[in-house]
Amino acid sequence: MGSKKSDLQDALVRYCIDRDGPGKEMYIFTNDEVKRLSMPIGFRNHNDATHIDTSHNLSPLMKKEGLGVIHLGTDRGVGNVARHAFIRNHEALFHEFEDISLENTTRQEYRPGPLDHLNTSEANILSMVNNHGILRGFLYPGDMRAIPQMYMAHRTRVRPRYRIGDINVPADLVQIEVDMTLEHEGSVTVFEAKNWKRGRGDFAIYQLYMPFRYYHQRMENGEIEVNNIECCYIVRRNMPGGSDIDVYLYTFEDPEDMASISLIKCKRYELRE
C-alpha cells in the first residue's frame, strides 16, 4: 500500500489524463487542483505533492505513464495560482549518480569539529566540507591561495527560458532555492547537498539547473561580471569513524536545455578519525 503522497500523485495523473486525454507530452495543473484532490485522500501537505527529488519517489502511476513533475511557477499579479506540469519522459528529469572509481577516492584524516554532526541539514553538510578544505581542494586543485567568495543559502524568483530536450517549458516566475554559491576569479559554482539514503541513486536535475539558469541568464544580460557557471552536488554518508563525501561537478552543455547536464569530474573523500 502506497503513502498518501503517492496516492495523491496517482490521483493527479488520473485527473489530468481524464481531462486532457491519454498520451500527451505535457499536462498542466494548478495548486488549487492539487489541494482539491488532496482533501478526500487526507494528505494535508499538498504543497509537498509536487516535490520529487529522486525517481525512487515517483508514484506507481507516474512510473507506468513515464511522467515526472516540473514547476511552472506563478505569473505576476494578485490571486494568480502556481502551476505545475507532468512531463512525459521522466528519465530526462533525473540524473543518475556516476560511479566513483578507486583512483578518484581519497582517504583523509578527519578531526571532527564540535558542530559537524550536530544536525543533518544541507547547510551543515556544506559547512563541514568547506571547513575541512574539501571544496577548495576539489574545485581549485593546485591553487593553495584560492580564497573563493562565499554566498550562503537564499531563495529568489526567476523566469527561466528553457526546454527539456525537445519540449519547450512555458515557465512563469519560479521560486528557487540556492543552497550555497562560491565565486572565484569569475567562475561561479552553485551547490546542492543531501544526506545519503537507500534508494537515492539519482537526483532531480532541476535542483542544480534552476540556480544555474538564474545566474546564467544574469550573466547573459550583463548583470553580473562572471564568465563561467558550474554546479556541484554533494552527498554525505555516515560511516563508522567518519563520513564518506561524494562530490560531483556538472555543467550544462546547452544552457537552455535542462537535459544537457554533463559531468566534469567527481571524487570521493573518505573522512576517518
Each PLM stretch: what is its role?
Residues 1-39, 232-273:
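C-terminal tail/extension regions appended to the core domain(s) of diverse proteins
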Residues 1-119:
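Nuclease-adjacent, charged terminal/linker segments that flank catalytic cores
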Residues 97-157:
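N-terminal, charge-rich interaction modules
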Residues 144-184:
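Active-site metal-binding core of divalent-cation-utilizing nuclease and nuclease-like domains
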Residues 180-182, 186-195, 211:
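Conserved catalytic cores of phosphodiester-cleaving nucleases, focusing on short active-site segments
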Residues 195, 201-202, 216-252:
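Nucleic-acid nuclease catalytic cores
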Residues 204-206:
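Feature captures the catalytic cores and cofactor-binding loops of soluble hydro-lyases/lyases
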Residues 208-216:
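Short, well-ordered amphipathic alpha-helices
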